[in-house]
């Protein structure tokens, strides 16, 4: 009997990629192109406002290891040697047009001064034509750098850029040692405009500068597992390496972001617990900490939790770094800027959420997880709430004005890998939160501000009462409100008057709230959207997008309705839904 041979293998398993073997046998590796599919059954997301239909599933090709990497044929599963840091697929999205970024009627005013304002040593050098953006110096196509293995440019890149809709989305995606530039508005979005293959380094995190973007210029920064930072301009195919060979900080970059409103400055979180501010146009120099000459008396009391190794106010700004802050000796997993550009929420593997005034180089508050480390963090569009995800499988909501935990959201069965607000489903009363995790699930949560003032029912009371969902503000002692100048608030329950007088600048340490005092918020929707862990979540005006560990980028179309007009008129009981919709019975809605 004639039997067709099996198709050539597609290499997608990250574990096998790292080890070069599976079950003690060498893995045959064949690199293929990206594959886009349109599942017949789809993966619909049923929510109160309608059904989100799966548009497509774009599967990125996983590159084979570089020839210089010797495969380990028989890895020892009990070996304690740590594997090189890697990351699942994450996306950085950007539109070059006037695409609406949010429908949320935000009243947030950016009053924060620019980072480094007042330090003449950081003043930008004058340029002849301000409209022309400075590009990196090196041509990546002609580069002989050992850091870059190969660059693949689409043969019709110029034509595709000229013919595309300026309102369409570009996406930058990492997958192992590859970095792809995709046009998601193209009919052939599975064909990358360019692909960079690095020799050994994996790009862990990346970000696009919204300030400098134009039809002729895009600034992209990438943080790598080697500690090197890659400044990349894809249209001209120019690049520059920052922190080359770890001259400033040799530990891997875990997260990287442009400072809001800045053309040159960005912050990189390193695995050794340091936040480093870089200038993309400055050269590197061997970093020597600029510790204060005096003893602890000259150091602000708040800095016991933030050691300033180099201040942004330093006059020594001829080379990178601009500033260096040490928060801990453990891994910084993520950070996020507040909408008013004043605060920085930082989460660490040590289980702390640290609220910083990064302009003043101070830690204001320290919150602790219920269990384990934090993995991700984001801000609400109005800056009133911070949401975190962690190794305790929980999504946690924190109130910034009240400086306290509002609710714990239970629904994941494994670590939460990403959280995000959906600004097109938020108004002044209700917020939509999304989360994804290692359990391959996508969860949606609706959080109603109006329910904060309802009296809390005892946790043994019937869970059908909606008042058990949110902890009341009256549960906490009185707190000082922040004035318009942005002064932070203190918790009377955590510090005595004597403490306030002796250490007025000491960060407020918030203990873990007990399960009996903290309310539980159930999801309105829970759905398994793949077979591998989900790593990233993004909301757009007309879509919801996720990306996974093995390279699946999935896009759902929103229900066909004017969501920004209709959503604010829905009742809070409808937005909260019932626990049964998400597969969680109503009887499980007691306190966590």
Swiss-Prot record:
Keywords: Repeat, Transcription, Transcription regulation, Ubl conjugation pathway, WD repeat
Residue ranges of WD repeats: 248-288, 327-368, 369-408, 411-455, 529-566
SMART domains the UniProt entry points to: WD40
One annotated GO biological process: carbon catabolite repression of transcription
Family matches, as Pfam families: WD40
Entry function: Component of the regulatory network controlling carbon source utilization through ubiquitination and deubiquitination involving creA, creB, creC, creD and acrB. Required to prevent the proteolysis of the CreB deubiquitinating enzyme in the absence of carbon catabolite repression. CreB deubiquitinating enzyme stabilized in a complex with the CreC leads to the expression of genes such as those in the proline and quinate pathways.
Family named by the database record: Belongs to the WD repeat creC family.
Name of the protein described by the UniProt record: Catabolite repression protein creC
